[in-house]
Amino acid sequence: MIQTAFTALLLLAIGYLLGAIPSGYLAGRWLKGIDLRDCGSGSTGATNVLRNVGKGPALVVFLIDVGKGALAVLLAKSVGLNDWLQVLTGLAALAGHIWPVWLGWKGGKAVATGLGIFLGLAWPVGLACFGLFMAVISIFRIVSLSSVVAAIGLPLLMLLSGSSSAYVVVSLVASLMVLWRHRSNIERLLAGTEPKIGAKAKG
């Protein structure tokens, strides 16, 4: 029991630290000498990297952020943690990405890391959400709209997949976290002022 509790706490800490790896911030600093927290949307995620650093760095940041989430839950699975502890490890990674200790608790909007988490937990659901994201972005070319639609679809897809209650609950929590992080984007979407891909405005 003590060993299991220690392992769980260790994985939660590792999950948070993985999520807190500031890939977007480092891309801005190393490649352009800028602090992404002071640029565009203020997010350190791939979308803000795309707008302020470039396409190549944005793709690398996206892949790293996906990897952070996937690695966290795969580590939890590899040591035999139950479903609830797996999802808590995933949420720890999500929290690390949104509130990284290294950057004054100001990070990304959790979309890429969230995708990684659900690819690790239930890859068919993760792929379905990514497909939904890509379908919306190909039509409207608005990243935030695609993120919001995918976030709303996530718990529904998880429920329909017949996954465990732990996975369904974490999908709902993650969805709400992503929507909360996109609240200003949602306001602009409703106002019709949210920028499309390629724009330099806030996003």
UniProtKB/Swiss-Prot annotation:
Disulfide bonds: none annotated. It is found in: Cell inner membrane. Its EC number is 2.3.1.275. It comes from Synechococcus sp. (strain CC9605). This is Glycerol-3-phosphate acyltransferase. One of its GO terms (cellular component) is plasma membrane. It catalyses: an acyl phosphate + sn-glycerol 3-phosphate = a 1-acyl-sn-glycero-3-phosphate + phosphate. Probably interacts with PlsX. The chain crosses the membrane at residues 1-21, 84-104, 117-137, 157-179. Catalyzes the transfer of an acyl group from acyl-phosphate (acyl-PO(4)) to glycerol-3-phosphate (G3P) to form lysophosphatidic acid (LPA). This enzyme utilizes acyl-phosphate as fatty acyl donor, but not acyl-CoA or acyl-ACP. One of its GO terms (molecular function) is acyl-phosphate glycerol-3-phosphate acyltransferase activity. Pathway: Lipid metabolism; phospholipid metabolism. Keywords: Cell inner membrane, Cell membrane, Lipid biosynthesis, Lipid metabolism, Membrane, Phospholipid biosynthesis, Phospholipid metabolism, Transferase, Transmembrane, Transmembrane helix. One of its GO terms (biological process) is phospholipid biosynthetic process. SMART domains: G3P_acyltransf (SM01207). The gene is plsY.
